[in-house]
Curated annotation (Swiss-Prot):
The gene is prmA. PANTHER family: ELECTRON TRANSFER FLAVOPROTEIN BETA SUBUNIT LYSINE METHYLTRANSFERASE. It catalyses: L-lysyl-[protein] + 3 S-adenosyl-L-methionine = N(6),N(6),N(6)-trimethyl-L-lysyl-[protein] + 3 S-adenosyl-L-homocysteine + 3 H(+). SUPFAM superfamilies: S-adenosyl-L-methionine-dependent methyltransferases. This is Ribosomal protein L11 methyltransferase. The lineage of its organism: Bacteria, Pseudomonadati, Pseudomonadota, Gammaproteobacteria, Lysobacterales. Belongs to the methyltransferase superfamily. PrmA family. GO terms for biological process: methylation.
Length: 313
């Protein structure tokens, strides 16, 4: 039976709060390890005295959830339970064994988004509909990184990119994919006519998956990947951020600064009911703000105001 595995780093001080949150949202098991294990800073814990609980200064917590759990829903529930904690660098993956992971990918089928965009697993034939001259075919191996097109948040972004391409607003444009996961959005944008793209993610596994998928699509020369702290400070004509509402709010200044005047932005990973706060948060920088809903998830899109009309956020 597969499980959804969550990992995070915390301190001895914040451990009880993280543990309470994980228990509240239904973690089936929680384990703790020294975050400095296998390094020169590893610290051995000897037999504790009576009434003492031995803990390291920094810990890596691992929690298991039912394999049918939605990682984004779990993360949203954790943020709602204790919004004062930093959930921005939580990692998720499906675990059991590599055979199960490959079996899941074998079940992943070709999908179409909008008029021209097709996501096709690397090990399957291109469907007949994707042979049209203007079709944008993305060959994908999602691996362990989030973003295969099957989740509503990703689908909302793919349809948005497709609509930009249809209206001619993606051709030759520069693209930032913040929270790139498997690289599906950056690669789709390039296939739809963007000139170059940058993928940013906190998870090194995501950057590896993005680079691998860029290679599968012969786009490695047009797609660069970075950890957030390493990303060059520059602006883009199109920015898409498929993360979560709390991170979108925190990063509003950063993301707004990445969009050129007149450029387009799409924000996804937003649960229905969270959109009003984000619309207000991004209004100082963006106009023509509108929402689209897919089940319980929302996408916000907008156009960057001209430089003379910007405000401080």
């Amino acid at each position: 039976m597969p499980f959804l595995e969550l990992t995070l780093s915390c301190s001895e001080v914040t451990l009880p709060r993280f543990q309470n949150a994980l228990d509240d949202v239904g973690a089936m098991a929680v384990t703790m390890l020294d975050a400095n294990a296998d390094t020169s800073n590893e610290r051995a814990l000897l037999e504790p005295g009576v009434g003492e609980m031995p803990l390291w200064d920094r810990l890596t917590m691992t929690a298991l959830f039912d394999g049918g759990s939605d990682a984004l829903v779990v993360l949203a529930a954790l943020e709602a339970f204790d919004p004062g904690l930093d959930w921005s660098q939580v990692g998720f993956r499906m675990v059991e064994d590599s055979d199960w992971i490959r079996a899941w990918i074998d079940l992943f089928k070709s999908m179409q988004f909008g008029a021209r965009t097709f996501i096709v697993p690397w090990n399957q034939d291109v469907p007949e509909a994707a042979n049209a001259p203007d079709a944008a075919v993305v060959r994908l191996d999602p691996g362990l990184a989030f973003g295969s097109g099957t989740h509503q948040t990703t689908a909302l972004c793919l349809r948005w990119l497709d609509s930009l391409a249809v209206s001619g607003e993606l051709q030759g444009r520069s693209v930032l994919d913040f929270g790139c996961g498997s690289g599906i959005l950056a690669i789709a944008a390039l296939k739809l006519g963007a000139s170059h793209a940058v993928g940013v993610d906190y998870d090194p596994q995501a950057l590896l998956a993005t680079a691998d998928n860029a290679h599968r699509n012969a786009l490695e020369a047009q797609l660069a990947v970075y950890m957030p702290q390493d990303e060059p400070v520059q602006t883009y004509q199109v920015v898409v951020a498929n993360i979560l509402a709390s991170a979108l709010s925190t990063l509003a200044d950063t993301l707004a600064a990445r969009v050129v005047p007149g450029g387009r932005i799409a924000l996804s990973g937003i649960l229905h009911g969270q959109e009003d706060e984000l619309l207000e948060r991004y209004a100082p920088w963006f106009e023509q703000l509108r929402c689209e809903r897919d089940d319980e998830w929302m996408r916000i899109e907008g156009v960057r105001r001209a430089a003379s009309g910007t405000q401080n956020g």
